[in-house]
């Protein structure tokens, strides 16, 4: 017999550690190459080539950008609140990455006779024969999204710059406006699945139609509101270059600036992963390929959609942004909840 800890073999713990590392590396590589993919996709949509110089067809461009930012000078404004200025990028970046702890990437795998779910915050219960995960996974993700905006607001305030402060204030107002609508949009999913567990929501979609077909309005509203919440075009008012130089990032340079950049793209990947889990059946797909492949394919399709939207739509004015959130999306989500409640009760 091999060495055991708490009645479980070392292979089990090694597999758990490897699972965390694989998810982290996957997210990190996706974030890095999402920047490259966006530049190439938008370039081709505008009849350009995009990055071409660094590596074959510019494939090494993310590495070149990372090296450049790493060696750039770290500048801190003389009148900035230095502690808050330095901690703000971390507050924005960390929640963007740890949200993946509750997202199921696929079915269980077997290691040393033990089944291990492809989800960080989950384990396989041999007594019930089911995967046990965080039963409020969706609330966990919504809470992390709320924490992330504190980093942006803190960056705007601590920089002691008018442009940065306006960007931070815009971000907080935008997050409040659209997180409310996004949260209400997915209540209809909870009503259908009768659970906040992401494993249960995915399992329910395996036995019938995806919730994107059962709840098309909720799917569209949640995806659009989530794009607005992470400040992606056409909702990128907090860092509007034509108005605020670079918004809350104006005074940042070097790796601190890169951390905000990574947080934006990590949030985009998180939003696409959550949308896949809630509305597109998670990892379920034709059985000739493993579940994790279908999950990644769906996530990448939604990431491409985000980039397509950026290349297609111009930026909203701020009054249009607020009007859309409060006078259009919020009433539509409430109407959808009422209609879903009536249908479920019949």
From Swiss-Prot:
It comes from Geobacter metallireducens (strain ATCC 53774 / DSM 7210 / GS-15). One of its GO terms (molecular function) is NADH dehydrogenase activity. The chain crosses the membrane at residues 14-34, 83-103, 136-156, 172-192, 208-228, 260-280, 289-309, 324-344. It is found in: Cell inner membrane. It is an enzyme of class 7 (translocase). NDH-1 is composed of 14 different subunits. Subunits NuoA, H, J, K, L, M, N constitute the membrane sector of the complex. Disulfide bonds: none annotated. The gene is nuoH2. This is NADH-quinone oxidoreductase subunit H 2. Keywords: Cell inner membrane, Cell membrane, Membrane, NAD, Quinone, Translocase, Transmembrane, Transmembrane helix, Ubiquinone. Belongs to the complex I subunit 1 family. It comes from the Bacteria. Its main location: membrane. NDH-1 shuttles electrons from NADH, via FMN and iron-sulfur (Fe-S) centers, to quinones in the respiratory chain. The immediate electron acceptor for the enzyme in this species is believed to be ubiquinone. Couples the redox reaction to proton translocation (for every two electrons transferred, four hydrogen ions are translocated across the cytoplasmic membrane), and thus conserves the redox energy in a proton gradient. This subunit may bind ubiquinone. PANTHER family: NADH DEHYDROGENASE SUBUNIT 1, NADH-UBIQUINONE OXIDOREDUCTASE CHAIN 1. NCBIfam families: PRK06076.1-2. GO terms for cellular component: plasma membrane. Its EC number is 7.1.1.-. One of its GO terms (biological process) is aerobic respiration. It is a multi-pass membrane protein. It catalyses: a quinone + NADH + 5 H(+)(in) = a quinol + NAD(+) + 4 H(+)(out).
């Amino acid at each position: 017999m091999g060495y055991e800890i708490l009645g479980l073999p070392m292979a089990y713990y090694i597999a758990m550690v490897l699972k965390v590392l694989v998810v982290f590396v996957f997210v990190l590589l996706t974030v890095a190459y999402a920047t490259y993919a966006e530049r190439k996709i938008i370039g081709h949509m505008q009849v350009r080539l995009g990055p071409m110089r660094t590596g074959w067809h510019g494939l090494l461009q993310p590495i070149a950008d990372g090296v450049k930012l790493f060696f750039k000078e770290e500048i801190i404004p003389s009148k900035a609140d230095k502690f808050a200025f330095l901690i703000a990028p971390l507050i924005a970046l960390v929640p963007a990455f740890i949200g993946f702890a509750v997202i199921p990437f696929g079915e269980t795998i077997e290691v040393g006779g033990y089944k291990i779910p492809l989800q960080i915050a989950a384990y396989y219960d041999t007594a019930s024969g089911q995967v046990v995960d965080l039963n409020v996974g969706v609330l966990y993700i919504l809470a992390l999204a709320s924490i992330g905006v504190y980093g942006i607001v803190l960056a705007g305030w601590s920089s002691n710059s008018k442009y940065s402060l306006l960007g931070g204030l815009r971000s907080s107002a935008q997050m409040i406006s659209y997180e409310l609508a996004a949260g209400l949009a997915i209540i209809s999913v909870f009503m259908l699945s009768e659970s906040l567990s992401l494993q249960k929501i995915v399992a329910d979609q395996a036995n019938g139609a995806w919730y994107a077909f059962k709840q098309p309005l909720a799917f569209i509203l949640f995806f659009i509101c989530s794009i607005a919440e992470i400040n992606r075009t056409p909702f990128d008012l907090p860092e509007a270059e034509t108005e605020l130089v670079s918004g809350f990032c104006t005074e940042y340079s070097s790796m601190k600036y890169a951390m905000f950049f990574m947080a934006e793209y990590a949030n985009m990947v998180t939003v696409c992963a959550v949308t896949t889990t809630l509305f597109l059946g998670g990892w379920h797909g034709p059985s000739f390929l493993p579940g994790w492949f279908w999950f990644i394919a769906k996530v990448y399709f939604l990431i491409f959609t985000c980039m397509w939207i950026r290349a297609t739509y111009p930026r909203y004015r701020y009054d249009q942004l607020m009007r859309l959130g409060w006078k259009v999306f919020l009433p539509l989500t409430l109407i959808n909840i009422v209609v879903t409640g009536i249908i479920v009760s019949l």
